Design a protein with these regions (language model features):
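Sec-exported extracytoplasmic/periplasmic mature domains
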Residues: 52-59, 141-145, 163-171, 231-236, ...
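Solvent-exposed, acidic/flexible segments
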Residues: 36, 40-47, 124, 128-136, ...
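Fold-level signature of zinc-dependent metallopeptidase catalytic domains
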Residues: 12-46
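N-terminal low-structure segments adjacent to metalloprotease catalytic domains
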Residues: 1-21, 291-298
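Zinc-dependent metallopeptidase catalytic helix centered on the HExxH motif
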Residues: 103-181
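Pan-zinc metallopeptidase signature
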Residues: 3, 193-298
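Surface-exposed patches in mature extracellular/periplasmic domains of secreted proteins
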Residues: 54-72, 145, 150-155, 174-177, ...
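Auxiliary, metal-adjacent structural segments of Zn-dependent hydrolase domains
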Residues: 36-121, 125-129
Length: 298
C-alpha cells in the first residue's frame, strides 16, 4: 500500500543553501530568510567542526567518494510528523532531530533532519559533553550509512563507539563512566536479546538515568560494548590501529548490507573467526569491553 512521503514533498519545495563545500542546507522559504540573516551560522559551524573530528578517524568512503552532508531544517510545529520522530522518546518534546533519508544524489544516504529551534536555540559555546557526544552520535549514523542501513543493533553500537571509544570522549564523560562502573554482566543484553528488542520495538526503552541522551539506555550501552569489543578484537588480532580497525570492520559491514537478523551476526563472526554462538548468545565480547573501560579508571 502506497504511503505518501511528506518529507520528500517538503524537500521538493524547499530552498537550497550551500554553507560550504561539504555542507548544504534545505529548508522552507520562510526559514531560508533566517538562514540568509545568519541565524543558523553558529550552529552550522559547530556541525562542520564535529565532522572534522570524525575526519580524524580516516574513514574511507566507498569508491573514494566525497558525499555532502545535507541538513534538512523543518518547522517546529510539525517536526515530529515530517521527521517521523519516535513517539517513545519525543512525545512531549518541542524540538529534535535525527538522520533521515537523503533525497539529494550528491549526499550521504542519510541527511540530518532537524527542527528549526535546534539551530536557533542550542548553545554553541561551551557545549556539554553529553550534547557533543549526542551530536557526534547522529553524525556517525550519517557517515555509517555509506556502509550499513537497517540493522539498528549494530548501527547504534557504531554510532556510540566512534565518539566514545575512537575519539576518546568517554575519558572526559564523567557521568557516563559512573554509570558504566555500576553495571554488571546481567545488566547487559546479549546480541540475541538486542535483536529481539529491535524486532518488538522495545530497543532503547530502558533508560538508566531519566532525561538523558540515548547513551544512558541499556540497549545502546550493550550495543556499544559489543561494537567496541569487536574493534578491540580486530586491533589485537591483526595488530591494527583503531582507525585501521574501523575501516576493516566497515569493509565487513559493506559486504553485508541489508541484513537485520542473526545471519548478519554470523557473517561478522566468520570474518573475525569467532564461534556463532559466542557472538550471538553469550556476552564475552561485551564483558571484555566493559573490563577494558574499568581498567582505564584504575
Amino acid at each position: 500500500m502506497y504511503q505518501e512521503d511528506y518529507l520528500r514533498n517538503y524537500i521538493k519545495e524547499s530552498e537550497l543553501r550551500v554553507f560550504n563545500d561539504r555542507i548544504k542546507v534545505r529548508l522552507s522559504s520562510e526559514l531560508a530568510i533566517k538562514y540568509d540573516l545568519g541565524v543558523y551560522t553558529n550552529f552550522l559551524t559547530r556541525i562542520e567542526n564535529e565532522m572534522k573530528m570524525l575526519d580524524k578517524l580516516k574513514i574511507k568512503s566507498p569508491a573514494n567518494a566525497k558525499p555532502i552532508l545535507y541538513i534538512y531544517v523543518v518547522p517546529d510545529d510539525n517536526f515530529t510528523f515530517l521527521l517521523q520522530m519516535p513517539t517513545l522518546f519525543f512525545k512531549d518534546k518541542k524540538s529534535g532531530g535525527k538522520p533521515v533519508t537523503c533525497y539529494d544524489l550528491d549526499g550521504f544516504p542519510l541527511a540530518y533532519g532537524l527542527s528549526q529551534n535546534c539551530l536557533e536555540n542550542k548553545e554553541t559555546d561551551n557545549l556539554e559533553i553529553a550534547d557533543l557526544e549526542n551530536e557526534l552520535h547522529e553524525l556517525s549514523h550519517i557517515v555509517l550509512s555509506q556502509f550499513l542501513l537497517g540493522n539498528q543493533v549494530i548501527s547504534e553500537g557504531i554510532a556510540e563507539t566512534l565518539p566514545l571509544y575512537c575519539l576518546r570522549l568517554e575519558e572526559k564523560f564523567e557521568k557516563y563512566k559512573q554509570v558504566i562502573a555500576t553495571l554488571e554482566e546481567n545488566n547487559i543484553y546479549s546480541l540475541k536479546e538486542l535483536l529481539n528488542k529491535q524486532r518488538d520495538g522495545s530497543y532503547g526503552n530502558d533508560a538508566v538515568l531519566p532525561n538523558m541522551t540515548c547513551s544512558f539506555r541499556l540497549s545502546y550501552i550493550s550495543s556499544y560494548l559489543f561494537v567496541r569489543g569487536l574493534l578491540e578484537r580486530v586491533e589485537e588480532k591483526y595488530l591494527l590501529s583503531t582507525t585501521e580497525a574501523i575501516n576493516y570492520l566497515f569493509s565487513i559491514l559493506r559486504g553485508n548490507r541489508g541484513y537485520a537478523n542473526e545471519f548478519f551476526i554470523y557473517d561478522i563472526a566468520d570474518a573475525l573467526e569467532l564461534p556463532h554462538d559466542e557472538l550471538l548468545n553469550k556476552k564475552d565480547i561485551q564483558r571484555k569491553a566493559l573490563n577494558s573501560i574499568r581498567r582505564l579508571e584504575m
